[in-house]
Amino acid sequence: MLTFARQQQRRNVRWLLSLSLLVLLATLLSLCAGEQWIAPGDWLSARGELFVWQIRLPRTLAVLLVGAALALSGAVMQALFENPLAEPGLLGVSNGAGVGLIAAVLLGQGQLPGWALGLCAIAGALIITLILLRFARRHLSTSRLLLAGVALGIICSALMTWAIYFSTSFDLRQLMYWMMGGFGGVDWQQSWLMIALIPVLIWICCQSQPLNMLALGETSARQLGLPLWLWRNLLVIATGWMVGVSVAMAGAIGFIGLVIPHILRLCGLTDHRVLLPGCALAGAIALLLADVVARLALASAELPIGVVTATLGAPVFIWLLLKSAR
């Protein structure tokens, strides 16, 4: 038994080291790749000063943090709701952030600064989160809380559809691009959003013990002494914050929160002590590679990153499911 535990521990360490190395390589690729390839040796030149330090570095950092946040949100929600299909959009938090952002675009007539749009997106996500907490205070079961989140998401989606229908052509283009996701407008002015993500990401990665208990089910978690109501509220708030900030920076991006935790579980990483940091690293890698593809796929334009993640990720996910079923 001790030998098996040591082997498992070594395997987990190898996984985390491998993912960390891949994050470094993907970051290097993201900083070098673009309309002009800039090798690391040229980063201190005048051209590197503009393209790498002023344009690509803030974008790369934003992609890293958003990828980690979305993957961690998916892992937390799948443990919290005991549902492998749970992901950040399922509770309606992503759509709530979308409603806040769309309301700011329409009411501000495109004149609001980027920081104001970001605050509105975060406010929308937190409003949906507070509504969910109101349901949670009634001691609803996890399944009913999940259904409440789905219903809120449908309502927010309907509001966004109405807003797009009544918007002007300029607003419509801006809203449609946001709904497909993208990092094209990220620069150092959004650094406050990046900083807002970091403490919550670190805190979530340290919560392996309660999440391991929650993954066993509500009854088992109570028997083990976990204050279920408290932890459910804390995790829902943390998830709402991460999703709201991510939507404010990059718009709606699917696939990452659903598939990354699932893929790691299929690879044998079931303990949240390893799964949480693994999700943060793997989510960052996946979104970095998708962002590079979005930038380089077309010579004259940039693809929406949400389209890239769905197109590349869905076949890989199906293949892994079929492989695990054999």
Curated annotation (Swiss-Prot):
The keyword Signal does not apply. Its main location: membrane. GO terms for cellular component: plasma membrane. It is a multi-pass membrane protein. GO terms for molecular function: vitamin transmembrane transporter activity. The chain crosses the membrane at residues 17-39, 59-81, 88-107, 111-133, 146-168, 188-205, 242-264, 274-296, 303-322. Pfam families: FecCD. InterPro entries: ABC_BtuC-like, ABC_transptr_BtuC, ABC_transptr_permease_BtuC. GO terms for biological process: cobalamin transport. Gene3D superfamilies: ABC transporter involved in vitamin B12 uptake, BtuC. The keyword Ribosomal protein does not apply. The complex is composed of two ATP-binding proteins (BtuD), two transmembrane proteins (BtuC) and a solute-binding protein (BtuF). Part of the ABC transporter complex BtuCDF involved in vitamin B12 import. Involved in the translocation of the substrate across the membrane. Belongs to the binding-protein-dependent transport system permease family. FecCD subfamily. This is Vitamin B12 import system permease protein BtuC.
